[in-house]
C-alpha cells in the first residue's frame, strides 16, 4: 500500500480524503475470545487513562499476511509488486481509512481522542469487546468513557464487555505499548 500523506482529489463531484494511515489490527488467531473484527489503528495513537500490564481484558494485535507461495499450503493469489516482489508471508499489514465527500458518514476511530478536522465528535471512550479468556468473540466497539447503567437485573453474566489492551509485535512496540488500553472516538460528517 503506497500511502504518501494526505490524498485529495476530485472524482466527479466527490472529494476523497485519507483520514487514517496505519496498522491493520485484530484479535490474535490463537485466542478463542476477544474482538472479532479487523480495525485500522493509526500511526499516531492517542492515549488517555490506562493501567500498565495485563489485566482481565480483551486484546488486539497487528495483522500479518499468512500467504504462502509454495507447498501444500500455497494460497497467495495477490501480486507482490508493491512489496518489491518480496514474499508477503508473516509481514505486517498496513491499512488506510478514507472519506468520500457528499455522503453522510459515522466513523469509529480506534486509538484516537480527537476527530479529524471538519468532523463532529459524537462521543469519546475506550475500545471494548468480549474478554480473551471467555472463549468467544464479539465486535470491537467504542464504549463511552462515562458509561450509563440501564434498567434490568444485575450480575447475570450473559454478555460482557471488557477494555481492549494492545499486544505489540506486529504492531510497532515504539508506539503501541503492550498492556495499554486503547482509546476511541466516534465522529460524524
Question: Which residues does each PLM region occupy?
Answer:
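Folded, disulfide-stabilized extracellular/luminal domains of secretory-pathway proteins
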Residues: 4, 11-177, 181-189
